[in-house]
């Protein structure tokens, strides 16, 4: 089975969020299942030089963007047994950031068509399935169906479209249809691309894909409701039989406390004394009082409303009256950055606010913290709670999306559970749940079982890869 995996980012070349992790780890897992899977993404100028220097040129050709023809280079590089292709065009991809550019509609219109044109220039590979991810590659699917149906190399390709976050849809003015995408006015309709008075790239992918997946079973159900559906819930309900919720994994080779080079001390489930040493050394590094017995709560996240920081804002003063240390890492909304900076100044022995991002420090926080807080308003899957579990940091989460599928609240009567959770998006409920977790932290027998249960869980991509294989097989065997 030949799979072309189209994405706007992939670790270790470019990563701004969870999509980058998925686009590296899932293809590796699918490769182990025997597929010939190849990944295609833009050649951003920010790709580390060590990779750029080793890319081999496959082809050069032009790609139509409306009435213009734009240069396109196709390069390749193998990483961990998977072949990666890179779409090269400095005008579109030599930027100071991968996204949030004024011409993103044009950039990813070019990229969508360049993906299809590239297939014509890869002599040893024709995909059976084109697997597109999020809005940046969504328009590739209707282009394939309605503009390339006479191309003998492309006309039998089936399509899978994965929604990583429905909130970000790629919405642009309707003039983009004919100016950049080569579609006529008839595509500005409710059954095609129209989203109120604009067009939605993501909607186009959902309408035209043979199968649709999203990144957890709960999120697959949530997005069919008005609250989570971002205006597409009716469409998603109509495509329910083609919609699959497949839980993301994490790369357990990269996220492994027994081999993680970023940790002060490596450890495993049989050596939790070394985890405690990580805590003490992080306390020293961040100028917090050195005390292995005080519960440390970690937060590693984008500081934005989706992640539930409005709840923290409501009760942070009360939370910091508890005998805890709170370690925060991330950037985002100025309100939340300023909030954490202020309370770190007010309570320097209780709060360390690290308003930047550092992958090494993130790993240290997972290893050192006793609890990991994710009170998200919505969370399609979430990776933080999975890394936390693997590193023995007990998650405290709101029951939404993938958090609901992976964290099971501790039941003191049965002893079951691997974390703590609350249902309503409510600050008092969150605070109660944190206090409940702190209470059980001091019961060492209960806490050690929670930590061990989390560390012994299977968070690899193997189960997800099996489910994606079934989705691919289903659409390939449909008449």
UniProtKB/Swiss-Prot annotation:
Pfam annotation, one family: Glyco_transf_5
Protein name: Glycogen synthase
Binding residues for ADP-alpha-D-glucose: 15
EC top class, as a word: transferase
Catalytic reaction(s) noted: [(1->4)-alpha-D-glucosyl](n) + ADP-alpha-D-glucose = [(1->4)-alpha-D-glucosyl](n+1) + ADP + H(+)
Functional note: Synthesizes alpha-1,4-glucan chains using ADP-glucose.
EC number: 2.4.1.21
SUPFAM superfamilies documented for this protein: UDP-Glycosyltransferase/glycogen phosphorylase
Cytoplasm is among the record's keywords: no
This protein's encoding gene: glgA
Record key words, sorted: Glycogen biosynthesis, Glycosyltransferase, Transferase
Similarity-based family: Belongs to the glycosyltransferase 1 family. Bacterial/plant glycogen synthase subfamily.
NCBIfam families: glgA (TIGR02095), PRK00654.1-1 (NF001898), PRK00654.1-2 (NF001899)
Gene Ontology BP annotations: glycogen biosynthetic process
One Gene Ontology MF term: alpha-1,4-glucan glucosyltransferase (ADP-glucose donor) activity
Pathway assigned to this chain's UniProt record: Glycan biosynthesis; glycogen biosynthesis
Regions annotated as coiled coil: none
């Amino acid at each position: 089975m030949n799979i072309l995996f189209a994405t706007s980012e992939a670790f270790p070349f470019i990563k701004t969020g969870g999509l980058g992790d998925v686009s590296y780890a899932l293809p590796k897992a699918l490769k182990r299942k025997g597929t010939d899977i190849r990944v295609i993404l833009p050649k951003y100028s920010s790709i580390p030089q060590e990779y750029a220097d080793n890319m081999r040129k496959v082809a050069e050709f032009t790609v139509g963007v409306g009435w213009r023809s734009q240069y396109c280079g196709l390069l390749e590089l193998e990483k961990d047994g998977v072949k990666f292709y890179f779409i090269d065009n400095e005008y579109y991809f030599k930027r100071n950031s991968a996204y949030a550019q004024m011409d993103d509609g044009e950039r990813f219109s070019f990229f969508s068509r360049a993906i299809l044109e590239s297939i014509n220039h890869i002599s040893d590979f024709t995909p059976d399935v084109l697997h597109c991810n999020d809005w940046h590659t969504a328009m590739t699917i209707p282009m394939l169906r309605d503009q390339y149906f006479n191309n003998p190399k492309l006309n039998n390709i089936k399509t899978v479209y994965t929604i990583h976050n429905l909130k970000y849809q790629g919405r642009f003015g309707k003039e983009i249809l004919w100016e950049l995408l080569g579609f006529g006015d008839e595509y500005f309709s409710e059954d095609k691309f129209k989203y109120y008075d604009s067009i939605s790239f993501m909607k186009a992918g959902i309408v035209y894909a043979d199968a649709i997946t999203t990144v957890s079973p709960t999120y697959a159900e949530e997005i069919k409701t008005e609250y989570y559906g971002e205006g597409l819930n009716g469409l998603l309900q109509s495509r329910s039989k083609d919609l699959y919720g497949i839980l993301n994994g994490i790369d357990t080779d990269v996220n492994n406390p027994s081999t993680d080079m970023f940790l002060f001390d490596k450890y495993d489930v049989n050596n939790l004394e070394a985890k405690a040493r990580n805590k003490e050394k992080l306390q020293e590094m961040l100028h917090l009082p050195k005390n292995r017995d005080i519960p440390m709560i970690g937060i590693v996240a984008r500081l934005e409303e989706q992640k539930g920081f409005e709840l923290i804002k409501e009760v942070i003063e009360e939370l910091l009256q508890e005998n805890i240390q709170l370690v925060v890492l991330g950037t985002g909304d100025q309100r939340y950055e300023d909030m954490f900076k202020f309370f770190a100044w007010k309570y320097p022995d209780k709060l360390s606010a690290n308003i930047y991002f550092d992958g090494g420090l993130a790993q240290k926080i997972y290893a050192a913290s006793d609890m990991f807080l994710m009170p998200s308003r919505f969370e399609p899957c979430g990776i933080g709670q999975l890394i936390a579990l693997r590193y023995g940091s007990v998650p405290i989460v709101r029951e939404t999306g993938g958090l609901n599928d992976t964290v099971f609240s501790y039941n003191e009567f049965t002893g079951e559970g691997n974390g703590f959770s609350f249902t309503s998006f409510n600050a008092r409920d969150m605070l109660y749940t944190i206090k409940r977790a702190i209470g059980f932290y001091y019961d060492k027998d209960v806490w050690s079982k929670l930590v061990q249960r989390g560390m012994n869980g299977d968070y690899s991509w193997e189960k997800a890869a099996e489910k994606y294989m079934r989705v691919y097989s289903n659409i390939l065997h449909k008449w």
